[in-house]
Structure formats: structure tokens, C-alpha cells
């Protein structure tokens, strides 16, 4: 999947977020400039809020999971472990899946 940053449409639609993979995030990070790498995080954040407001729990959980992964693996800002833990916990509250549980364990280690 080719992830696109758009200021005209700064959200992912549900179909896109559910089809997106961790490899898509990794490829985007490797191919994009620093500004777009950060913009992706904020598009995920905006999408999370949009899906939560619409009670689209699975899509919201996927956004939170991607945010946890992206913070923990790609961006690694100060406090990345704590921030990633916050978002993976949020993902699990919305949609408790084995994939999210495994990431919660990985982040905790």
C-alpha cells in the first residue's frame, strides 16, 4: 500500500486503515522525508479521534496500534516506550486481539 499524506483529507478512511500493515508503515518511513514521517503520526492521531467519535472501534483500535508501533519502532522520540504503551493499551481497550496483546508484551520488555 502506498501511504499518502494529504492536507486536504488528513484522515485515513476505514477501508485503508484496516488494509494497512506494519510493513506499509516501515516502507513509508524509509521512503519519506522527516516532515512527512511526523505527519503520518498526526494523520493516524486524527483518524483515531474520527473513528472513536463514530464508534468505529476496530478502525480506531488499528490506528492506536499503528501509533504505538510507529512511536516504538520508527520515530523513537523521548518517552517512546511510555507513549507506545499508552496507545497499545488504548488499542486493547477498543479491540482486544492477540496481535495487540503481543505488542503490549514487546513494549513492556
Model-derived features with residue positions:
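N-terminal leader/capping segments at the start of a protein or of a new domain
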Residues: 1-7
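Amphipathic alpha-helical repeat scaffolds of TPR domains
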Residues: 7-35, 57-73, 98-106
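Helix-turn-helix repeat elements of alpha-solenoid scaffolds
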Residues: 33-47, 77-83
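Flexible helix-coil transition and linker loops at the boundaries of alpha-helical arrays
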Residues: 45-60, 91-101
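TPR/TPR-like (Sel1-like) alpha-helical repeat modules
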Residues: 79-97
Amino acid at each position: 500500500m502506498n501511504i499518502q499524506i494529504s492536507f486536504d483529507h488528513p484522515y485515513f478512511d476505514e477501508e485503508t486503515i484496516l488494509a494497512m500493515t506494519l510493513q506499509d508503515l516501515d516502507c513509508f518511513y524509509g521512503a519519506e522525508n522527516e516532515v512527512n514521517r511526523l505527519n503520518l503520526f498526526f494523520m493516524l492521531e486524527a483518524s483515531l479521534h474520527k473513528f472513536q467519535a463514530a464508534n468505529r472501534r476496530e478502525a480506531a483500535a488499528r490506528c492506536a496500534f499503528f501509533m504505538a508501533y510507529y512511536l516504538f519502532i520508527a520515530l523513537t522520540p523521548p518517552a517512546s516506550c511510555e507513549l507506545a504503551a499508552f496507545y497499545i493499551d488504548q488499542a486493547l481497550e477498543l479491540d482486544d486481539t492477540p496481535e495487540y496483546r503481543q505488542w503490549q508484551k514487546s513494549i513492556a520488555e
